[in-house]
Amino acid sequence: MKKYYILDNIIDKTETFKIYNNLISTPSWTLNRLTDDTNDLESSINCFPGMVVEDKGQSYNTYLSGYFQFLTTIIKNEFKKQYNFDLPENILRIHLGAKNHKSETLFHADMEDSRAWTILGFLTPVWKAEYGGNINLEGE
């Protein structure tokens, strides 16, 4: 089985703008998210804005929790259609992170459970190549 799969254009540009504007208007953001918990005080310069929407069954924003639960259903259906494979039903957490070109994300595993899946989405409605940025999955 592959380590990662790619699904493009799950939501259209209009919907992306709607959820993007909703997200940036939500007051639940914190500015101290890190990819790895550490006691190193200097690591705080690598923090980025983040929001916990849902964690271990606890919803912190009912609207966004419902939105991302529904979006996950759409992704799972598209995944089944494209790859003929069922993703697990349970969702352990929905966390959001806002990154920019200076954000440093260290290599990490989202979960220790080898059966767990991560759905990583990009919700930037307008993107230009000069903005930079990339995602590195297992060195690829």
Model regions: which residues?
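Non-heme Fe(II)/2-oxoglutarate
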Residues: 1-87
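Catalytic core of non-heme Fe(II) oxygenases with the double-stranded beta-helix
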Residues: 65-140
